[in-house]
Amino acid sequence: MTQMTPPEIVSELDKHIVGQARAKKAVAIALRNRWRRARIDEPLRSEITPKNILMIGPTGVGKTEIARRLARLANAPFIKVEATKFTEVGYVGRDVDTIIRDLVEIAIKDGRERAMRVVRDRALDAAEDRVLDVLLPPARPVGFSEPAQPQDSATRQKFRKKLREGELDDKEVEIEVASAPMQAEIFAPPGMEELTQQIQGMFQNLGNSRKKLRKLPIREALKLLADEEAARLINDEEVKTEALRAVEQNGIVFLDEVDKIAARADAHGADVSRQGVQRDLLPLVEGTTISTKYGMIKTDHILFIASGAFHLSKPSDLIPELQGRFPIRVELESLSVEDFERILTSTDACLTRQYEALLATDGVTLSFTPEGIRRLAEIAYQVNEKTENIGARRLYTVMEKLLEEVSFEAGKVGVDKLTVDAAYVDARLEVLAQREDLARYVL
């Protein structure tokens, strides 16, 4: 779990997301509260439950990006799911319990990777020993009663040094490695994903004990053997126990597109039980016990962050019980021209920098003037206002259209430099931006 303070978390998010200070502050406080709660003694600690967050705002303003960046900062089990993928129990589709099962799988995978990193050096030493045993086999005994003669340690150390310096990387050796687990694709009715996983696990375990001889370059052999040795050194039971504890105490679930399961009060017609999905989410968000193949998981202290554009519905269209489970509400603002400018220039991997790097591979020096960037931001904002407002995603469309010609011609003789100023932007985009009918289809 991260030990960053709320200002530090917001500062990290600022490197990738423009504006939306209130949303960043809310998720930073929620993340820090997980750390604070862990330092409180029982029985008070078990009484402190996370305050779930509902983020409301138009598409393309940073809701999903906040979730993506938060996942990297959290250092805790994290899963992002779309609410539209789930249906009420009894309908065709996935039921909401699979969210927690998937979260457990993610936590165990992350835990195993961390454990393998801890024993990596020991595993590499063991892998080197196995390769050296192949390169320098023990001398054959003269009689049956005499033991095998070990190789001179000085020779072994000399070969180990060559091995570590990469001098033997391309030499091929024949080694005995565990055979790859049997891959069996099993199709089962919706709602039976756990049974499917158990059957697949059974088939995979059938082939785990088998070993086979393979001829490989030493570079690849070392990697395979190191992975095999690391898997032997870690304690799977400890990994699973720690993963289950981390999910229960520090797990974070990001529910995207939650507005799509909010049925409008004035809506009528076919509906695959949107309210049913909401009712199924209720116990999950409030706190219940979910059965997984690794054990029972309590969801009482899992943090839920929901987000939605709420274009066609309102937060009040959610059933009242679910509304009450998200006490913290944050509204994200639409992007202004200034925001578009900052997205193009001030984030760590801004679009202008990405295109400069892409075209540099073909020997084209691309540069943007401040006036050109301002004009780009104005056009993106205008098109959003005149047609559908898709937020920052409009910049992808505008930039692709702007640089279409140079991207196509890059690599040809004479195409080695381009400066994007206001005049160039107008020449390429102004006609399209002014004609609403064209902008609707092209931009």
Curated annotation (Swiss-Prot):
Annotated binding of ATP, by residue: V18, G60, V61, G62, K63, T64, E65, D256, E321, R393
CDD domains, per database record: RecA-like_HslU (cd19498)
GO biological process: protein unfolding; proteolysis involved in protein catabolic process
Disulfide bonds: none
GO terms of molecular function: ATP binding; ATP hydrolysis activity; peptidase activity; proteasome-activating activity
Stored InterPro entries: AAA+_ATPase, ATP-dep_Clp_protease_ClpX, ATPase_AAA_core, Clp_ATPase_C, HslU, P-loop_NTPase
SUPFAM superfamilies to which the protein is assigned, alphabetical: P-loop containing nucleoside triphosphate hydrolases
GO cellular component: HslUV protease complex
Compartmental location: Cytoplasm
Major site of localization recorded for this protein: cytoplasm
Keywords assigned by UniProt, alphabetized: ATP-binding, Chaperone, Cytoplasm, Nucleotide-binding
Family: Belongs to the ClpX chaperone family. HslU subfamily.
Function text: ATPase subunit of a proteasome-like degradation complex; this subunit has chaperone activity. The binding of ATP and its subsequent hydrolysis by HslU are essential for unfolding of protein substrates subsequently hydrolyzed by HslV. HslU recognizes the N-terminal part of its protein substrates and unfolds these before they are guided to HslV for hydrolysis.
Subunit structure: A double ring-shaped homohexamer of HslV is capped on each side by a ring-shaped HslU homohexamer. The assembly of the HslU/HslV complex is dependent on binding of ATP.
Entry-linked NCBIfam families: hslU, PRK05201.1
Descriptive protein name: ATP-dependent protease ATPase subunit HslU
